[in-house]
Amino acid sequence: MQPRVLLIAALLVLLASARALEAEDPSLLGLMQGYMQHATKTAQDTLTSVQESQVAQRARDWMNDGFSSLKDYWSTFKGKLSGFWDSASEVQTTAASDAS
């Protein structure tokens, strides 16, 4: 073969491979865009999940604090009521022994 024919054949092969690479670039770009969209959605979903988890934790803490305060209030009320009940019983016992 003549050197010109080899040179032209090599040039045609290079042009054909360059065209093939150009055809792959948009699909590679599309693939990367799809990957980035998926990664963005995953990050957003994770962030939303974490925020919802934090809100749920705050709600649980608020409920626990409320129940704790209610139990403290009930304990105080019960203590005062039982103290009143005990003193009322003593008054009745004392009054009954004085009457005898």
From Swiss-Prot:
Keyword annotations: Chylomicron, Glycoprotein, Lipid degradation, Lipid metabolism, Lipid transport, Secreted, Sialic acid, Signal, Transport, VLDL
Region (Lipid-binding): 68-100
Gene, per the UniProt record: APOC3
Protein localization: Secreted
Family classification: Belongs to the apolipoprotein C3 family.
Signal peptide (residue range): 1-20
Record function comment: Component of triglyceride-rich very low density lipoproteins (VLDL) and high density lipoproteins (HDL) in plasma. Plays a multifaceted role in triglyceride homeostasis. Intracellularly, promotes hepatic very low density lipoprotein 1 (VLDL1) assembly and secretion; extracellularly, attenuates hydrolysis and clearance of triglyceride-rich lipoproteins (TRLs). Impairs the lipolysis of TRLs by inhibiting lipoprotein lipase and the hepatic uptake of TRLs by remnant receptors.
Annotated source species: Neomonachus schauinslandi (Hawaiian monk seal)
Pfam families reported for this sequence: Apo-CIII
Main location: secreted
Superkingdom of the organism of origin: Eukaryota
GO molecular function, one term: phospholipid binding
Classification via InterPro entries: Apo-CIII, Apo_CIII_sf
Listed GO biological process terms: cholesterol homeostasis; lipid catabolic process; lipid transport; lipoprotein metabolic process; negative regulation of high-density lipoprotein particle clearance; negative regulation of low-density lipoprotein particle clearance; negative regulation of triglyceride catabolic process; negative regulation of very-low-density lipoprotein particle clearance
May interact with the LDL receptor (site feature) positions: 41
UniProt protein name: Apolipoprotein C-III
PTM annotation, UniProt: The most abundant glycoforms are characterized by an O-linked disaccharide galactose linked to N-acetylgalactosamine (Gal-GalNAc), further modified with up to 3 sialic acid residues. Less abundant glycoforms are characterized by more complex and fucosylated glycan moieties. O-glycosylated on Thr-94 with a core 1 or possibly core 8 glycan.
Cellular component terms (Gene Ontology): chylomicron; intermediate-density lipoprotein particle; spherical high-density lipoprotein particle; very-low-density lipoprotein particle
Keyword GTP-binding: no
Residues of this chain annotated as glycosylated in UniProt: 94
